[in-house]
Amino acid sequence: MIRSIAEPPVRIRSMGHDDLPMVSDIERRSYEFPWSHGVFRDCLLAGYQCIVLERNNRVAGYGILSIAAGEAHILNLCVDPNYRSHGYGEQLLDAILLQARSAKVREVFLEVRPSNLTALALYRKKGFHKVARRPAYYQASEGRKEDAAVLAKKLISYDR
């Protein structure tokens, strides 16, 4: 008899101040030039849409969305390196896009490193397309800089 092994349930919820140590830890393990704990705290204090994805009651990823004037900007989307390749990034992105739609956002923007092929593939799959390039946007190793690809996705048009 073949048994099916079920994946542990995941839950997406609002990020709270108690999540910041785990979020900061994931950020440090994911990026060479990570956001500081204070940047995450400031995002919460500013009222940005901050969410976490939990697996087995442990934060496995997070996303941060800024909304203003009918536009949204995905500021950060990250999955713990130990939990990648399970579709959690896509689940987080779907949740962020749902928040944007609920806020009647017309267009969502983000920056991504052109070297981050996994993220680029996910964003393209979800309908984002390149609209610009920001030269020398990201810090890179050995004092170098890396450009950012600016991606956008149109959501439903809302009448004013």
Features from the language model and the residues they span:
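Short helix-coil transition/hinge motifs at the ends and kinks of transmembrane helices
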Residues: 2-6, 140-143
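Acetyl-CoA-dependent GNAT
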Residues: 3-7, 11-86, 90-99, 103, ...
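Short hydrophobic/aromatic beta-strand or adjacent loop that forms the aromatic wall/cage
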Residues: 48-50, 145-150
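Short amphipathic helical patch at the helix-1/turn junction of helix-turn-helix
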Residues: 79, 113-114
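Short glycine/proline-centered loop/turn elements that form peptide/ligand docking sites
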Residues: 93, 116-119, 136-142
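Conserved catalytic-core motifs of GNAT/GCN5-like acyltransferases
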Residues: 109-111, 124, 129-147
